[in-house]
Structures are given as C-alpha cells and as structure tokens.
Amino acid sequence: MIIMDVSVQRRMAAEILKCGIERVWIDPTQLDRVKMAMSKDDIRALIKEGVIKKKQKKGISSARVKKLKEQRKKGRRRGPGSRRGAAGARTPPKERWMATIRALRKTLKQLRDSGKIDRKVYRKLYRMAKGGAFRSRSHLFLYMREHELLK
C-alpha cells in the first residue's frame, strides 16, 4: 500500500474542525478521495460524509480516585500513618465547640436539677460557658470549686 501525503488536507480539516492536526482522523480506505480534495469546501463535504472526523480529546482517568474513595468509604486508609495535620485540623473547630458546649450545658442542667447549684448560679455559668470561659467539664468544676459555687 502506498502512503499518500494528505498533510495539506489534514491541516485544512484541523482548521475547519478547530482542533490540532493530531486529532484529525482520516478514513484509511478513502485516502485517494481525500487526496483529491483541494478546497476547504471539499474537506467540509468529506467531514459531512464521515470520511474525516475529529478524534476525542484524551482525558484524565478517575478510576484510581474512585477506587480510593470506595476504600475510604469502607474505613480503609484512615490510620495514623495516613493522617496529615494536627488532630484539630481534622475535626473542624465548630464541631469541637459543639461537642464541648453540649457537654457543659448537660452538666449544668444536671447540677441545677439535682440542686447542687441554684438558678442564679446556673444562669451565670451558662452565660460564661456560652462566652467560651470553660475549656471542658473539668475546667467548669475547677471554677466552681475555686469560687465555692457548689452546695
């Protein structure tokens, strides 16, 4: 088989198809017809017939990403060796705050209901907790002992 030079036609097709020369596909069985095409109109006619086509762009495969995601969904790859950043970086600050404030409010409510603190003290400590005065439950108890608020 003789290899025909269709570089001019390929270049014209690339211009018409708005792609690079490498992405132009020419039907190997119709090379003689393509060789005869001299004008852009001839090339357009061949494109319409399907003799000349535009190859699809090469993409980036997401198969590996999907596989990793599936494994993480199962709980794999989450051990200490895979973790980057401090513990605080992995749990958002808002979630940490929510956990702390819920524990403090639950504790305060229990103390008020059991009569260990009165309503006034409860309200004062509740407001302080909201303002971020206590780091934890133990810090709250320390404050109450220091200020003799427990009955």
Swiss-Prot record:
Protein name per its UniProtKB record: Large ribosomal subunit protein eL19
Bias-annotated ranges (Basic residues): 57-81
Biological role stated in the UniProt entry: Binds to the 23S rRNA.
Top-level division of the source organism's lineage: Archaea
Signal peptide: none
Pfam family, one: Ribosomal_L19e
Organism: Methanocaldococcus jannaschii (strain ATCC 43067 / DSM 2661 / JAL-1 / JCM 10045 / NBRC 100440) (Methanococcus jannaschii)
Gene: rpl19e
Family affiliation: Belongs to the eukaryotic ribosomal protein eL19 family.
Keyword tags: Ribonucleoprotein, Ribosomal protein, RNA-binding, rRNA-binding
InterPro entries: 60S_ribosomal_eL19_sf, Ribosomal_eL19, Ribosomal_eL19_arc, Ribosomal_eL19_CS, Ribosomal_eL19_dom, Ribosomal_eL19_dom1
GO cellular component: cytosolic large ribosomal subunit
Segments of this protein annotated with the region Disordered: 57-95
Cell division listed as a keyword: no
GO MF terms held by the record: large ribosomal subunit rRNA binding; RNA binding; structural constituent of ribosome
One annotated GO biological process: translation
Subunit structure: Part of the 50S ribosomal subunit.
